[in-house]
Each structure stands twice: as structure tokens, then as C-alpha cells.
Amino acid sequence: MDHAGDAMRTDLMTITRYVLNEQSKRPESRGDFTILLSHIVLGCKFVCSAVNKAGLAKLIGLAGETNIQGEEQKKLDVLSNEVFVKALTSSGRTCILVSEEDEEATFIEPSLRGKYCVVFDPLDGSSNIDCGVSIGTIFGIYMVKDFETATLEDVLQPGKNMVAAGYCMYGSSCTLVLSTGSGVNGFTLDPSLGEYILTHPDIKIPNKGKIYSVNEGNAKNWDGPTTKYVEKCKFPTDGSSPKSLRYIGSMVADVHRTLLYGGIFLYPGDKKSPNGKLRVLYEVFPMSFLMEQAGGQAFTGKQRALDLIPTKIHERSPVFLGSYDDVEDIKALYAAQEKTA
């Protein structure tokens, strides 16, 4: 079979070329999305460089301010947020930005507006910077009907309305995972070229995995279905092997491993935090979008995660996401609890 003419050759496919290829499949496209994405990619490159130099540049210490979530901000958080706000604003393709670091949504001035809303966590897992654990940027993109009259309602949409979502992981390599609604692809930054190259084409999560990922330190406060599920992972009664526990504590790293190897990532609600800790718009939705596009599932304990309609920009929700069959197992436990309630 001759692959010479294959437009999807992974050794040559940059993220820019990939997005242009996708654009050519949509006759109605005017290139706005491509321009927006190129600005997100630029932001990721900048943050990747800053993360790599953090120790040398003395960026690691606390900036002395506290963000809307009550977390002490790291200097890198502040820098990353500024980078993405500026990159997205200067694209001329956005009208509303929602960042994990900012209390209010940012409405772009009319002369610079475009038809997209971007929700993002500029540096997820930043408490892990000091010890060298992988951290990352998470983003989701919505399209609005009329950017001139855009309101907060244009952002408070269910995740299924997103037109694209992705994350960039800053670890042993800089990896950008993206879905524009037709599958999931992974790109790795080649430092010598300064380009993201397609290294993981058409990612599909295995139907069932051997790994579960959860903070078991919260186990005493879990609800019944979560407790039963984790018990089943550790002590299966059907003769299967126990699942392995892998938990990094950086959502991007834990979800990335789950996406590639299969299994399930759990961040349940508990007695202390009934709605869990993860934010709906810029953590739960983008990761759920990617999981579904890769053939997996995402569930809140009550419904499909992408069907959730947020009422506040920093709203939180429990989430169970990963391999299709593994999420089915936890859904069955919640359904059984509903019947007995």
C-alpha cells in the first residue's frame, strides 16, 4: 500500500496544517477558527517555555494574591493567565473569555470581537510545579449567535454545544490534545522546529481499562456508589484481576493517561464538597468532550456530563470519565441507588 500521498502522514503533519485540512472540509468556514486556534497554540508554546524555565527564573514562588477559588496564586498562574487573555483578545475572534483565575468573565471590547467564547484553566495543577509533576492548560470553545450582543448566557451552555476542546500538557514533552468534534488527535511540540507535530492520530480510548484514578484520601466522605465502585476495583468478585490505582493529582496528567491507556478517572462529590472540586466550564466539559470524542464516556453521578447546564461560570460538578465500560459500571451503581432511594 502506497502511503506517499497520504495527507495524514504523522511525521509531516503540523497542528496548523491539520486545522487547515479540517477547515477545507467545511465550505462555510472563513478561517476564523484556524486563526483562534493558532493564538491558543502560541499561548501554549509561551507557557511551555515559562514552565521549563520556572526554577531558573524564580517564577515558582507565590505571587502573594489569592484567586477566586481561594487558592494562593503561583507566579506562573498569573503569567499564564495574562498570556492567554492577551493571545485570545489579540486574535480578534473572541467575544467572551472565562478563566479559572478571574472572578468575572472578560467581555472583549467591540472593535476586537469575534464569534467565539473561550473557557480555560490557564495552568491546571499548578500546586505541583515545585516537584516537577506534569501540569497543563485546559480549554473549550463555544460559538455565539451574535457576538455584538453576546451575554453570559452564551457561555452558560451545556458542554455538548462546544465546537472544540483540548488541553496542553507540560511534562517530559509538551503535548497538545485537541478535538474539533471529529475525533481526538495529539500533537507534540518539536523544540527544534517550534512546531506541534501530529504524534497521536485519531486517539481511541480502550473500551475497558486496568487503571482507576481517584484521591482515596477522601474515601471516608464518599457516597455509596463511589465507595462500592472503588471496592470493586480493588477486590473484584467476578474473578477478574484488581485494577491498579494511579493518581497524580494533576487533572491534565491523570486524564491524559486515562485517555491513552484506558480506565477511569473519578472526582466524586463527598460530604465535605457535595459538588466535587472540579469546575464545570473549563475542567469537566473540555475533558468530557475529549473522552466522548475518543469513544469513552463522562458522567456526573446524575447525568451525562455534557448535558449539564451550568448556572454560574465557576460552578463545580462531580465527574466520572474514561473507558466506556468502566463508566457504565459506575452508572449502574448510581442507578441501583436511585431504585432503592
Curated annotation (Swiss-Prot):
GO CC annotation: cytoplasm; cytosol
Q: Where are the transmembrane segments?
A: none
Query: What terms describe the molecular function in GO for this protein?
Result: fructose 1,6-bisphosphate 1-phosphatase activity; metal ion binding
Per the UniProt entry, the Enzyme Commission number(s) are: 3.1.3.11
Instruction: Name the Pfam families on file.
Output: FBPase, FBPase_C
Q: Where in the cell is it found?
A: Cytoplasm
Q: Could you tell me what reaction this enzyme catalyses?
A: beta-D-fructose 1,6-bisphosphate + H2O = beta-D-fructose 6-phosphate + phosphate
Keyword Metal-binding present in the record's keywords: the answer is: yes
This entry's comment on the bound cofactor is:
Binds 3 Mg(2+) ions per subunit.
Which parts of the sequence bind Mg(2+) 1? E71, E100
Please state what class of enzyme this protein is. Answer: hydrolase
**Binding-site residues, substrate:** D124, G125, S126, S127, N215, Y247, Y267, K277
Binding residues annotated for Mg(2+) 3, in chain numbering: D121, D124, E283
Which family is this protein grouped under? Belongs to the FBPase class 1 family.
UniProt-recorded name of the protein: Fructose-1,6-bisphosphatase, cytosolic
Q: Which organism is it from?
A: Spinacia oleracea (Spinach)
